[in-house]
């Protein structure tokens, strides 16, 4: 079964001084041009997974139905665990 969503809510520790947020949004636009990307924040302190989780918890009540992409990366290229959650309702 294929799910089709119209929104991606986007939270990162990337900051906005460089091109990384823009690159992710360009890739999304290329893959799914119908999708609106909603920026929650990109100013989570670097590598601070707890701060990212707290920001997401505060925002989730306002996030529209769709996909939430949260990236707080403890180090590019390092061994780390990913989390994927599916919520219905």
Predicted features along the sequence, with ranges:
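Charge-biased, low-complexity intrinsically disordered regions
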Residues: 1-89
């Amino acid at each position: 079964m294929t799910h089709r969503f119209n929104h991606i809510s986007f939270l990162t520790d990337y900051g906005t001084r460089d091109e990384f947020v823009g690159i992710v949004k360009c890739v999304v636009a290329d893959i799914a041009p119908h999708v609106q990307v909603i920026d929650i924040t990109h100013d989570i302190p670097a590598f601070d997974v707890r701060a990212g989780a707290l920001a997401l918890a505060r925002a989730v009540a306002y996030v529209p139905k769709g996909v939430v992409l949260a990236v707080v990366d403890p180090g590019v290229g390092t061994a780390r665990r990913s989390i994927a959650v599916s919520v219905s309702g």
